[in-house]
Swiss-Prot record:
The N-terminal domain has the RNA-binding Sm fold. It harbors the endoribonuclease activity. It is found in: Cytoplasm. The gene is pelA. Its cofactor is a divalent metal cation. The lineage of its organism: Archaea, Thermoproteota, Thermoprotei, Thermoproteales, Thermoproteaceae. It comes from Pyrobaculum islandicum (strain DSM 4184 / JCM 9189 / GEO3). Monomer. This is Protein pelota homolog. Keywords: Cytoplasm, Endonuclease, Hydrolase, Metal-binding, Nuclease.
Length: 330
């Protein structure tokens, strides 16, 4: 994602480059923000019977947001507060921005919003991880998964219902290739990985171009084995999985070395004790007035911040503990 932050005018210019960038933009936008950009809207000048859809530059005051990970879409709704010269009758009406990769928008934040933490969130988006299309295959089942910085999504499951001889494997692998080709067109992964028992992936690699990762299992079990493996380590770091595992360990041996829930984390933040904080994305959206100043203070005291998706591997556990926890320095 390309971005510029004008701290004097409190304006953030953003150009999302990948669908994952839309998630980070969603995190940054709060109700009451001003969003500017080019958009398409039906316009009907006075005296004209029928309107037409035209491209115009306008600004809205945000009232609501709608982010869909699986559809790769971000919609921002609000009331028009600014419009380009020569366009009458639009100001004061409602409008929806559809934010898509390649389209620039501006976010104007309120004066009490900590811009320091904006840079931290944008850096998370900038630390681009490869998008992986994982084909986890064995002789009975193939599971297709899509792995990004936002988590793991199971896209499709295919079963080998034929005999386990060479001719049926040819049909099986040919069918797998067709699904792979379609998923590559749809998701545009950076890397395609073929994982499973050595003999199976060697045969499958004659049909599918991919990085081969031999492992004990294929199918759904193979997806989880791949996630636990070393190749997935960088994703685990970025998504906070390793930090959460450290948190659980420290909680079991020394309760005073961690903070649980907003009150404890805020108290530790005020004392400058935060080493790393894990915060649920839904808590940020539900209580921005509490969470953004907290994260800004963590950032100022050189603590690390991990934003965790509620539907991720550690999201459920984090939600059960109030949506925010921290590892403490002392």
């Amino acid at each position: 994602m390309r971005y510029e932050v004008d701290t004097k005018r409190r304006i953030i210019k953003l150009v999302p480059e990948r669908e994952e960038d839309l998630y980070f933009i969603y995190l940054l936008i709060d109700k009451g923000d001003i969003i500017r950009g080019w958009t398409v809207r039906e316009y009907k000048p006075d005296g004209v019977k029928e309107g037409e859809r035209i491209k115009i530059y306008l600004a809205i005051k945000v009232e609501s947001l709608e982010y869909h990970k699986f559809r790769g879409s971000l919609r921002i709704r609000g009331t028009v507060v600014e419009v380009q010269d020569g366009i009458e009758g639009v100001k004061g009406r409602r409008h929806t921005f559809d934010v898509t990769p390649g389209r620039e928008i501006e976010i104007e934040k309120a004066y009490d919003y900590p811009l320091d933490v904006v840079i931290e969130v944008l850096n998370m988006a900038k630390a681009v991880l490869p998008r992986v299309l994982l084909i986890s295959v064995d002789d009975e089942e193939t599971v297709f998964a899509y792995i990004t910085a936002l988590g793991v999504e199971i896209l499709h499951t295919m079963y080998n219902t034929g005999r386990k001889d060479d001719s049926m494997f040819e049909e099986y692998f040919t069918a797998i290739k067709e699904v792979v080709d379609e998923l590559k067109r749809r998701h545009k992964p950076d890397i395609v990985v073929l994982a499973g028992p050595s003999m199976i992936i060697e045969q499958a690699s004659e049909y599918i171009q991919a990085i081969k990762v031999p492992q004990g299992s294929g199918g759904l079990a193979g997806v989880y084995e791949f996630i636990r493996g070393g190749l997935y380590e960088k994703f685990k770091i970025e998504m906070g999985i390793n930090v959460y595992q450290r948190f659980i360990h420290k909680l079991s041996v020394d309760r005073l070395s961690v903070a649980i829930g907003l009150n404890e984390v805020r108290e530790a933040t005020d004392a400058g004790r935060i080493e790393t904080v894990l915060v649920l994305d839904t808590l940020i959206k539900e209580r921005p007035e509490d969470i953004w100043p907290l994260l800004a203070q963590v950032y100022k005291t050189r603590g690390k911040i991990h934003i965790v998706k509620e539907d991720s591997e550690v999201g459920a556990g984090l939600k059960a503990m109030g949506g925010v926890v921290a590892l403490l320095r002392w």
